């Protein structure tokens, strides 16, 4: 699906035109170790069209670089089901307790979020990219009621 606007000089993409976006999510557990769970998430999307603030889209536009990201995670069930610890008074209200480690943006892609526009003395506008965060680690503790 494309979102284009017809102008005198031809077709110009609208600011929301993203030509493709592909996402993948995979989650599984290790058969010999059912308390462990692994997840993989990948996203690859086309860049959005941008134009300088003082110029119209018809005068000139460009696309941001593609958005790419890969996340992985590993979780372990600490308690749940028939585990002995679940018989203690504090844990009786929980179905299960999980601890997990995630790595966001595993491949450390430098994705562009937006642009800061710098105007020179000749009124030319230059786009300076603002990048999203790089690789991050996340430790989580999850309680299911």
Each predicted region: which residue ranges?
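C-terminal beta-signal and adjacent terminal beta-strands/loops
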Residues: 43-53, 76-145
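Residues embedded in well-ordered secondary-structure elements
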Residues: 15, 27-29, 61-63, 90, ...
């Amino acid at each position: 699906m494309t979102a284009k606007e017809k102008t005198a000089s031809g077709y110009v993409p609208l600011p929301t035109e993203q030509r493709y976006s592909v996402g993948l999510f995979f989650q599984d557990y290790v058969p010999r170790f059912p308390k462990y769970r692994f997840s993989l998430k990948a996203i690859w999307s086309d860049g959005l069209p941008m134009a300088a603030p003082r110029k119209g889209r018809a005068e000139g536009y460009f696309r941001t670089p593609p958005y790419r990201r890969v996340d992985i995670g590993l979780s372990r069930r600490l308690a749940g089901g028939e585990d002995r610890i679940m018989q203690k008074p504090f844990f009786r209200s929980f179905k299960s307790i999980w601890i997990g480690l995630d790595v966001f943006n595993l491949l450390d892609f430098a994705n562009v979020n937006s642009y800061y526009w710098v105007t020179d003395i000749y009124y030319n506008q230059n786009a300076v990219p603002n990048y999203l965060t790089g690789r991050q680690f996340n430790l989580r503790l999850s309680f299911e009621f």
